[in-house]
Amino acid sequence: MERNVTLDFVRGVAILGILLLNISAFGLPKAAYLNPAWYGAITPQDAWTWAFLDLIGQVKFLTLFALLFGAGLQMLLPRGRRWIQSRLTLLVLLGFIHGLLFWDGDILLAYGLVGLICWRLVRDAPSVKSLFNTGVMLYLVGLGVLMLLGLISDSQTSRAWTPDASAILYEKYWKLHGGVEAISNRADGVGNSLLALGAQYGWQLAGMMLIGAALMRSGWLKGQFSLRHYRRTGFVLVAIGVIINLPAIALQWRLDWAYRWCAFLLQMPRELSAPFQAIGYASLFYGFWPQLSRFKLVLAIACVGRMALTNYLLQTLICTTLFYHLGLFMHFDRLELLAFVIPVWLANILFSVIWLRYFRQGPVEWLWRQLTLRAAGTAISKTSR
């Protein structure tokens, strides 16, 4: 099957874009990911950086990646049940290892678990419309749960939102020293992530996967619609997303990121805007692909998309080395951390381009495929990596 280079490019953008937000999760305490005022006071530099990233990137690139993951489930259906279940089960195992031994911000475990449920929904959906509508419904259920959590939450500030000095020192200690203490804390993080997945986030993740599968089945993610359609759709959806999210950003700033309102209720506009902006971004890439495809950088980013799993893990390897093993954790603010993003992007791009000159797949993708073939009991092909 001939590869869809546009789809690879969009996936590459998603992987690179995720790092814009993850870099603060690597370089700062966990509370800083959503709360720029995690340490009490906040500088204008931090506030403006948070606002800009929240508007263009927070949740949007993860949503885009979930959309493409769902599209991949649709594309895998001809492989059959054993192949898909083996592939996703291996992803669950990889995510568990990644989250337990390397980094507490893993997304692979969640994607694998939700994928094991969603692929059957994709397979059994009688039409594109029913698949899309089910995805929208599941996503809205997740938003409803988020609203419920906000309504029942205590007005007392949580230590997870604004940790005290001892909590910050302890987090810094176990991240820099590693060992059994770090594994124990990451295990707690995996447990908390699974609880959040089952209670709230899993609904949204499943919804986006089904929407992505519907867009693939309809031909939309295959580029089968007109350039004019993609351009108009993209501009409209991005505008809608910005209009929904911008007032919430301003209100959080106005409220000084108070836990009572900002930890749950004012997260909702961002979560609601994310599908509009994520699909809008993809639509603009498809609409302007004839122009974009002329640039070598765009084709290089498509190589990153072909090796998405490898590059996601490479980001973890580089960033945990820098911030935990070399001791750069908590040495930079939110804006300064962005200076690390471009070198990591360059590493992703250069490694992908060079690797794919000699092999057909990324190293982790190749291993994943070989293990899937064995687990599914399928004859192993002799194709090159």
Predicted regions and their residues:
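Solvent-exposed interhelical
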Residues: 80-82, 119-134, 214-236
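Specific transmembrane alpha-helix
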Residues: 63-78, 109-122, 200-223, 273-293
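Membrane-proximal cytoplasmic C-terminal regulatory module of class A 7TM GPCRs
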Residues: 360-385
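Alpha-helical transmembrane segments of multi-pass integral membrane proteins
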Residues: 205, 259-358
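Long hydrophobic alpha-helical segments that form multi-pass transmembrane helix bundles
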Residues: 133-215
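Juxtamembrane membrane-water interface segments that cap and precede transmembrane helices
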Residues: 41-53, 178-193, 256-267
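Membrane-interface helix-loop-helix modules in multi-pass inner-membrane proteins
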Residues: 81-83, 90-121
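N-terminal signal-anchor module of multipass membrane proteins
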Residues: 1-69, 76
